[in-house]
From Swiss-Prot:
Keywords: 4Fe-4S, Amino-acid biosynthesis, Cysteine biosynthesis, Heme, Iron, Iron-sulfur, Metal-binding, NADP, Oxidoreductase. Coiled coil: none annotated. This is Sulfite reductase [NADPH] hemoprotein beta-component. Pathway: Sulfur metabolism; hydrogen sulfide biosynthesis; hydrogen sulfide from sulfite (NADPH route): step 1/1. [4Fe-4S] cluster binds at residues 470, 476, 515, 519. Alpha(8)-beta(8). The alpha component is a flavoprotein, the beta component is a hemoprotein. It holds the Pfam family NIR_SIR. Its cofactor is siroheme; [4Fe-4S] cluster. Component of the sulfite reductase complex that catalyzes the 6-electron reduction of sulfite to sulfide. This is one of several activities required for the biosynthesis of L-cysteine from sulfate. Its EC number is 1.8.1.2. The gene is cysI. Siroheme binds at residue 519. GO terms for molecular function: 4 iron, 4 sulfur cluster binding; heme binding; metal ion binding; NADP binding; sulfite reductase (ferredoxin) activity; sulfite reductase (NADPH) activity.
């Protein structure tokens, strides 16, 4: 695991083995709150989204009127930005675009709806309602995301309010699942650590509730609620966020070592549980400044792994979470959204200054970080008994797509039948899988019988168990290449290659995204594929197996048909030269195939293969 202890973030090594760290000069942090006046925003040339938020009336915009316009399945461009805060994206079926364009038809518009499910825990009753929604409004599919929640795809505009009412009926919502806010809060799911999971889940839920936008716009628009009377006083309507919310998305996770299945270093804010000998939480290490997204061809954008900023007692964790988020609210870049995430804020002003401001807002110093160790970021498949005697079954769900597959697993129907008899709860994992959790010992046989009856998968090959893919085409408007629809075929090819070198059971993380936004966190995967164009990908290698170190660009613009041939000699070399217990990403660096990435600022340095790879 790479060291993420606090350091002077200014000391960024230049390329080369003998480079001397150079002291960076940081900018002076701002001292004022974000601009909320329209004229001042124009004068300062703030990003377009800032103007939209200022004029939105706390996320209302013209959404209510737009829903009544039946001549189009879309909404206005400005409302398309605001609806994200309500948990939705306007999309269209890109497979149908050419034919519809030829016929001079409007795009096949629909909406993706994302739920807010802190910690990924839902009851069987909620599962059944979500299943009904999937069958009625979303083409018979639920999608477990890489951030422990569900998405619906293909919901048309005329069904939006009915869908939202059904979600509300499950005592769930979609508020802040997208947008410039604190999004769904993830929590560790390791079923063997029952006590620690309870603490992690509770912290995730507390943060989610505390940092939730307070505007009543969601209930007014989607559930026909009455507008709350009381004026537009910022302190009253949004006491934490203010009128303009955050500069950009903000993602929070809670991890429990030794498992890093939430990929804590890839997120803006994280809490790492520090456990005593009885597996009880004594406090939390706080991480800040992680994030995956970047833009092809723009080196001032980069992924970054989070720094461990300090240690807090359990009673201070919530105050620290709010302080970190509000510093980002006030310091984040509101002129350039490509440099607006917390990772860039810390690079701009320095970790020391950021920590000092957090401590000022909390009213006390953070403690020194406590030792911790992560050993991987995968799930534990099959049955696991928790330390309270309850049982937990983790099912492998390819790319999180819960639907009935012709000639294959009947995920939607099978999990519905399980929900009808299950007495515990369900947990979604950050690896897009489902845990049937808290099963009494006497109910295991009944669950097993249903799993077998519907062909549900308890596991898969080592490579597939360690895989993630974003949705990409046909619904994501940002996708440059296939991801979810392509990765299974690629893994079949790579499984053959790995088996030929005696590596069939070697755990190697592989992740694919259709664009460099990195929703499946490819830049902390030992093999990362990032869409560059139709059937072309950038290939990234050399990340840490536990998600603690970024990868490096190994080869640009690789044709899909060439990926196996590119990786095969590297697999051969790994099989010949690895040390006991050495992971693929670590070996590629030690053997000199690819340079080590220290952190975000040097992500674009020393790219490419450092030496030829051969089979012989």
């Amino acid at each position: 695991m790479d060291d993420h202890s606090p350091r002077d973030a200014a000391e960024t090594p230049a390329p080369g083995p003998a480079a001397t760290p150079a002291k960076r000069v940081y900018e002076t942090p701002p001292t004022s709150r974000p601009i909320t006046d329209a004229e001042a925003a124009r004068a300062e040339k703030l990003a377009a989204n800032e103007h939209i938020k200022i004029a939105s009336g706390y996320l209302r915009g013209t959404l209510a009127d737009g829903l009544l316009k039946h001549a189009t399945g879309a909404i206005s461009e400005d409302d398309g930005q605001l609806v994200k805060f309500h948990g939705m994206y306007l999309q269209d079926d890109r497979d149908l675009r050419p034919e519809r364009t030829k016929k001079k038809l409007d795009k096949a518009y629909s909406f993706m709806i994302r739920l807010r499910i802190a910690g990924g825990v839902i009851t069987p009753k909620q599962w059944l309602i979500l299943d009904d929604i999937a069958r009625t409004y979303a083409g018979g599919a639920l999608r477990a995301t890489t951030r422990q929640t569900f998405q619906y795809h293909g919901v048309i505009k005329s069904n939006l309010k009915r869908t939202m009412a059904a979600i509300d009926g499950a005592l769930l919502d979609t508020i802040a699942a997208c947008g410039d806010v604190n999004r769904n809060v993830m929590a560790a799911t390791n079923p063997a650590q029952t006590g620690a999971h309870k603490a992690a889940y509770q912290l995730a839920k507390d943060i989610s509730d505390s940092l939730l936008p307070k505007t009543s716009a969601w209930r007014e628009i989607w559930l026909d609620g009455e507008r709350v009377v009381g004026g537009e006083d910022e302190a009253e309507v949004e006491p934490v966020y203010g009128r303009t919310y955050l500069p950009r998305k903000f993602k929070t996770v809670v991890a429990v070592p030794p498992s890093n299945e939430v990929d804590i270093f890839a997120h803006d804010l994280g809490f790492i549980a520090i456990l005593d000998k009885k597996n009880q939480v004594t406090g939390w290490n706080v991480t800040v400044g992680g994030g995956m997204g970047m833009t092809h061809g723009e080196p001032d954008t980069f992924p970054r792994t989070a720094d461990v900023m300090g240690f807090v007692k359990p009673e201070d964790a919530l105050k620290v979470a709010e302080a970190v988020m509000t510093v980002q609210r006030d310091w984040g870049n509101r002129k350039n959204r490509k440099n607006a995430r917390l990772k860039y804020t810390i690079e701009r002003y320095g970790l020391d200054a950021f920590r000092a401001e957090v401590e000022k807002r909390v009213g006390k110093k953070l403690g020194a970080p406590k030792p911790f160790t992560f050993t991987g970021n995968g799930d534990r498949y099959g049955w696991v008994e928790g330390d309270d005697g309850r049982h937990h079954l983790t099912l492998y769900v390819p790319s999180g797509r819960i639907k009935d597959i012709d000639g294959g697993p009947q995920f939607l129907s099978g999990l519905r039948r399980i929900a009808e008899v299950h007495q515990g709860d369900f947990r979604l994992t950050g690896n897009q899988n489902v845990i049937i959790a808290n099963v009494p010992a006497e109910k295991r046989a009944e669950i097993d019988a249903l799993v077998d009856e519907y062909g549900l998968t308890r596991g898969a090959s080592a490579l597939r168990r360690s895989s993630l893919a974003c949705v990409a085409l046909p619904t994501c408007g940002l996708a440059l290449a296939e991801s979810e629809r392509y990765l299974p075929d690629l893994m079949t090819e790579l499984e053959e290659s790995l088996a030929s070198h005696g590596l069939a059971e070697e755990e190697i993380t592989i992740r694919s995204t259709g664009c460099p936004n990195g929703c499946a966190r490819p830049f902390i995967s030992e093999i990362g594929l990032v869409g560059r164009g139709p059937e072309r990908y950038h290939l990234y290698l050399g990340a840490a197996h536990d998600g603690s170190r970024l990868s490096k660009l190994y080869k640009e613009d690789v044709a899909a048909s060439e990926i196996r041939d590119t990786l095969d000699p590297l697999f051969a070399d790994y099989a010949r030269g690895r040390q006991p217990g050495e992971h693929f990403g670590d070996y590629l660096i030690r053997a000199g195939h690819v340079a080590r990435t220290t952190n975000g600022p040097d992500f674009h340095d020393r790219t490419g293969a450092l030496k030829p790879a051969t089979l012989g």
